[in-house]
Structures are given as C-alpha cells and as structure tokens.
Amino acid sequence: DPTCKHFGVCGGCKLQNISYHTQTELKEDKIKHSITRIFNDAKINPIIRCDNQFFYRNKLEFSFTDNKWLTQEQLDSGIDFPERRGAGFHIPGFWDKVLDIDECLLQPEPSNALRNFVRDWAIERDMPFFNARSQEGWLRTLMIRVASTGEVLVVIQFKEEHAEAREELLKELAGKFPEITTLQ
C-alpha cells in the first residue's frame, strides 16, 4: 500500500503503489530502452538504490491556487469546502488544477512546515492565491531547497505586488525558520 495519503491524486509520486525494488527495475528498464534505441552498444550501469525512498529530494516546487482540487472522497463527504485556497502539486494532466497537500514524503523538514506556514499565513490575511486561468493572484509558487548541511533556500514567486504583506511574510518566515539561509 502507498505510504502517502495523497497518492493516486497528487502528481508528486507515481509508483508508490509498488515496491521500491520494482520501481527502480522499471526505471532502469526505461532508461536502457531509451538509450539503446539511439546507441545500440551503450553500456548502462545498474541503478544504485537509495537507503531511504522517502525524504530524499533536495528541491521541490509547490503551486498556489485559489481553487484547490477536491478529491472524490471530499466531494462524497457532503461537507462544504468554502475555503478553496491551497498549496501543493498539480493534478497529473491538468495545468490548472492543484491538490492542496499538508504532508509530502519527498522532501525532509522543514519543507512541509514551510509550505503549510506560507499557505496558512496568507489565508489568515485573506491574500489572493494564484488563478492559472486568469493569471491573477498574489501567491504563485514556492520553491524549497534543503541542503544536506541543513541549510534551506526558499524562493516565493509573487504575481501581484503587495509590498507590505510580502515583507511581513518574509520577515516572519526568517524568524520562524532559522535554518533558512536564503530567502527571496
């Protein structure tokens, strides 16, 4: 069974429903096929598997949306979801649909805490999130890079100018997350 609760809807992981060993075999076969199709005699070394299949990515980019994707489970719940702003990954095959995620197993902390903080901070202040169709909204993307040294780089892409809110957000991020060494 997939470990991630967002698996199957989110576009972040695609093979979590099969064993890690099988995942790497499939990827290796795909690489071999692609390269040997062009270079017949190419020697392809086997994939070196990671010790841990989770929290291995050093960089992720999350998208903000003013109309988050609701899962079938959410739609079937009968619950009204008046707050539609969110931050997460695009639904596979949809450039304008984003699944709001609260936990991603791809990148180590403080990735989840940072994403959730920025999303919640902006919602509490009623800041506009990006709409891919109209190309309007303040918060557009959040890129987080976590180095093996523990240093963190954060880049927030703002579509609209709200200088006072931007400066307040960046100041609060720097204060709450001392591991951030670069913040833009």
Please identify what each model-predicted range represents.
Residues 1-184:
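Accessory RNA-recognition modules of RNA-modification enzymes
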